[in-house]
């Protein structure tokens, strides 16, 4: 599972008994942003979205307001709504926040009761196997998806819906930056090794080590991304 829709839910528009139309439209737009179809800086045309989905502009407007509150789009007076472009300082702040979140989740995961921890470890085993396979194929998109599954499984294991929501907002915003900068091939083998260490700590029920490794992993990942971006812009 990923912390955002992986497919545009347009087919659900015919059945809104359990979900508000605005939320379905929000998920539709969000899925397109996360897939990179609506890139950072691109204007989202409200009438076009409404016409494509065969609905009025009211739920589209509500959906865009929800996305703005999540930090994914920005509204500019007399210009419209645009997919947000992150400044480097914002990215650094988000990574600092994510490191705190991941450390907390790692500590909680390492302290789970045995049965719950074993269930989590099965999911993490599958995700690390997927990362390893993607790394061998040099499949950056596949690797990133498995990486997200790994971290999201740990976050969900905390069992705190508000924490999961806050983490989701941070990861979604960081994903904008990845799309914006098209970072590729980010030392996947080294990253797999870091995930293996985290997995071993959680499997052993070592909450303190899980916490430390999760924070270190996020800081190291940020450093790798920054170094690659610096090299690309220095060419």
Could you tell me what each predicted segment is?
Residues 87-88, 177-181:
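Short alpha-helical transmembrane interface motifs in multi-pass membrane proteins
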């Amino acid at each position: 599972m990923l912390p955002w829709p992986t497919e545009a839910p347009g087919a659900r528009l015919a059945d809104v008994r359990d979900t508000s139309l605005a939320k379905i439209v929000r998920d539709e737009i969000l899925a397109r942003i996360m897939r990179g179809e609506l890139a950072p800086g691109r204007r989202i045309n409200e009438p076009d979205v409404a016409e494509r989905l065969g609905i009025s502009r009211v739920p589209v407007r509500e959906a865009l307001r929800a996305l703005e509150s999540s930090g994914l789009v920005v509204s500019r007076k007399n210009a419209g709504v645009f997919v947000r472009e992150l400044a480097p300082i914002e990215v650094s702040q988000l990574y600092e926040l994510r490191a705190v979140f991941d450390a907390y989740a790692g500590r909680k995961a390492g302290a789970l009761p045995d049965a719950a921890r074993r269930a989590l470890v099965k999911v993490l085993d599958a995700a690390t196997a997927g990362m390893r396979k993607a790394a061998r194929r040099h499949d950056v998109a596949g690797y990133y998806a498995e990486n997200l599954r790994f971290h999201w499984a740990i976050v969900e294991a905390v069992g705190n819906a508000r924490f999961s929501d806050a983490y989701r907002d941070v990861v979604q915003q960081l994903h904008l930056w990845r799309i914006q900068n098209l970072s590729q091939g980010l030392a996947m083998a080294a990253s797999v090794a870091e995930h293996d260490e985290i997995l071993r700590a959680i499997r052993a029920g070592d909450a303190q080590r899980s916490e430390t490794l999760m924070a270190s992993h996020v800081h190291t990942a940020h450093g790798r991304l920054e170094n690659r971006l610096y090299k690309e812009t220095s060419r």
